[in-house]
């Protein structure tokens, strides 16, 4: 056993809180999928509309590549994908690609390991598909993958207050607000290529009560495992928002 005046839990999976007995939110029907980002070189970036992704409602992705992949799914095996989204870097001919996805409980070591292996296979498969079917990627080669699979959703604690999507989208101003969020509510489907993306009309507020649970006054939980429903979490889960929660938890401690 370990004792301390404050414990700050800012990891992706609230294992400490779980082992201490903090109640968790119900997982719901499905978790958002995990994705592995990869980097390609040899791309004809002059022919690729790098910063001009098609906008369909509020979803930004390369519509031409998406339609080509959807057509391919009808006659050959194409893994589940999202987007695709890509962005350039400072090196000409190099792009970062976000398109892989798989459903898994990434808080479970066995499922996480299986997902990691599967997504690395999909990276190679998608690289070959892009080479064969998208002219700008004809000479592309795989340069790197992310150090590990990106996880959008696992466990969340049940705190003194559970931030709801309704409160978040309407920017309810809480008296104990400690941080704000402005990223869209971004929910990726784990069973299709779909995505729900809803932009905020104004920056949302996140209350301190979402970082602590009844009966655990010296444990602060920051990051995407804070107390929120699936809709609010789908916005706050990104880097800038969770950094704000970490700063708030550190100041409170």
What are the functions of these language-model segments?
Residues 2-252:
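Flavin (FAD/FMN)-binding glycine-rich loop and adjacent Rossmann-like elements that form
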